[in-house]
Amino acid sequence: MCGRFVISSKNPFDLEYTPSYNVTPSQLIPIKTKHRSKLIKWSYSPLWKKDMNLINCRSESMKEKPSFKEAKRCIIFHDGWYEWQRKGKEKIPFYHSSKSKNFAGL
């Protein structure tokens, strides 16, 4: 997952949410689990290390990593995300979006 993304919709998953064009780790984000929708802090910590605060994982190694073995699945709503490219000493953000408007989450 990217390090910054956009939620410009006011009620994703029927939750009251203040739109942001710069959602960053540790902010509250709207998610949908199998049974309900809720706002949670964007980060992930395994049960055995509460202060790990991960924000992404590789799908191809997720099943083998001890950090993610007990993780529950969710859907994260978004309107788009940023990927950064370096040009010399400068980092330039490029905005991307997709039709699905959802990330897979843990």
What are these regions (language model features)?
Residues 1-106:
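Short linear sequence motif anchored by a di-proline
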